[in-house]
A protein has these predicted regions:
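Generic beta-sheet signal
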Residues: 5-9, 110, 177, 263-269, ...
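Hydrophobic "anchor" residues
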Residues: 14-15, 145, 348
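Catalytic core of membrane glycerolipid acyltransferases/transacylases, capturing the structured
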Residues: 124-141, 261-321
Length: 466
């Protein structure tokens, strides 16, 4: 018989945003199993766990705490486990669900491996569609816990032993399996599988992962995004996204009141320059929002810029394949409350097309809006090409006479989703309406103006409309 692969997930700080125990504790209180007790001290303990992860002493205390469960009614514990489900499910990281589905599609078995008592963790594992739940089992007698632990304490090497026993009994090869955990104490399990991943790692696991070359992930963010001290790079660098720190441009922002303060939406802007992403980043920094930018594959394939784009959570688009993967990734980002930024033109127009009064867009933004129901916020950019024209390898840096750059935000649109073509026309018309009057008038450009719309070293036809 051919062995199968499994994807093994830890629970606290891996699948969940924090610890499950505060939620279970409240449910146990409501069912009359335990008293409210604990007060501020308990909150401090849970807060430390959420930020730094588990410690040897805290886990030994957890092991000993099994003795205090003697006499707990199994029926009441089961009721508490079910009562806790809605709050627990709300704490599951959005990209954890995406990752689990990817493993399902590959035919992997899904396994939840946690120190949490089986009576509590089992219903959650079932609700999430896990194939197995490997959790600490407390001894039972006459409808109550008896204060003992039966089998392994599912932590550290005890977790590895539980996984190995289950794998052997179910014809699963750990040499083909994956494991995800936040804890340094799960290193034995991570070392035993083919594909270990440190998720939201505690400091020691983060160091170990770097030394071993294991991937690092945060399941509240898209794959590739890196977090430091609980914050992603976009958030950490936001104070640096200040127009005053860019003396080669004079920025004018208008319509900031049209930017939603929360929830996902699609930001659509026209494309005139390599400087456009900077202008949009400054705009969203003013709004305090995190953004997922759709960009062409050439950006993501570049040695340094590509790495930065992935770390910032950008979405790679390979227009040659026609794949819907970028659309699905953008839809997931919107569902988690992020802003998705798209330039529907797809690229900076060249030649005469750059000066056309009517903007032409691709269908992706309209399709995304129709698929998700997300609002579209149009943004007009003007003057960015004077800072960094397509013909220049680097931006101009004229601090004596910096060009004016206008960033104008319009009212949100709610497209109908019936026709991607018509919705695209609506979006592009809304962007055009935000631009200065001169943008909507026919213009006969000079050869120098045309040359600025082509890449460096271009020697072909200047008056092309492509």
């Amino acid at each position: 018989m051919v062995s199968r692969a499994a994807a093994i997930f830890d629970l606290d700080r891996t699948l969940l945003d924090g610890a499950s125990w505060p939620i279970y504790h409240q449910a146990l209180v409501q069912e009359g199993v335990v008293s409210a007790g604990g007060g501020p001290a308990l909150g401090i303990v849970f807060g430390l766990f959420r930020g730094l992860g588990e410690s040897f002493l805290s886990m030994q205390a957890t092991r000993l705490a099994a003795g205090r469960t003697r006499g707990w009614s199994l029926a009441a514990v089961d009721a508490a486990a079910v009562a806790a489900l809605p709050e627990l499910l709300a704490e599951v990281h959005p990209y954890a669900l995406v990752l689990m589905e990817e493993h399902r599609q590959r035919g992997d078995l899904l396994v939840l491996a946690t120190t949490t008592p089986y009576r509590l963790a089992g219903p959650l594992a079932q609700a999430l569609g896990f194939d197995a739940c490997l959790a600490t089992r407390y001894g039972e007698v006459e409808g109550a816990f008896d204060g003992t632990i039966e089998g392994p304490f599912v932590w550290n090497r005890g977790k590895l032993n539980a996984v190995q026993s289950w794998a052997s009994a179910n014809n699963v090869s750990l040499a083909a399996s994956s494991a995800y955990s936040d804890s340094f104490f799960d290193a034995p399990l991570l070392e035993a599988v083919a594909h270990p991943t440190a998720v939201n790692p505690d400091p020691r696991l983060a160091l170990l992962a770097v030394l071993r070359g294991w991937p690092l992930r945060w399941l509240d963010k898209p794959a590739g995004v890196v977090k430091l001290a609980g914050r992603e790079l976009q958030e950490l660098t936001r104070p640096l996204l200040n127009p005053a720190l860019l003396p080669n441009a004079r920025f004018h922002f208008e319509g900031l009141e049209h930017l939603p303060s929360e929830g996902g939406y699609i930001l659509c802007a026209n494309h005139r320059s390599y400087f456009d992403p900077t202008a949009i980043a400054l705009l969203l920094a003013k709004a305090g929002r995190t953004c997922r930018f759709l960009g062409k594959k050439e950006v993501f394939d570049a040695p340094v810029v590509g790495t930065l784009a992935r770390v910032l959570g950008g979405i790679r688009v390979d227009r040659g394949t026609g794949s819907d993967e970028p659309l699905a990734a953008a839809a997931q980002a919107l569902a988690t409350g992020d802003v998705v930024a798209i330039m529907p033109q797809g690229t900076i127009p060249r030649g005469m097309a750059f000066f056309e009064p009517t903007l032409k867009g691709r269908l992706g933004a309209a399709r995304l809006a129709g698929l998700t129901g997300a609002a579209v916020v149009p943004v007009g950019l003007w003057g960015t090409e004077r800072v960094w024209p397509r013909s220049a390898r680097l931006p101009h840096f004229d601090v004596a006479r910096p060009p004016a750059v206008r960033v104008i935000v319009g009212e949100a649109l709610q497209v109908l989703g019936r026709s991607a073509s018509r919705d695209t026309e609506t979006i592009m018309a809304a962007i055009t309406a935000l631009l200065p009057a001169e943008a909507r008038q026919p213009h006969q450009p000079t050869d120098d103006e045309l040359r600025a719309t082509f890449p460096p070293g271009y020697h072909g036809e200047l008056r092309s409309r492509s």
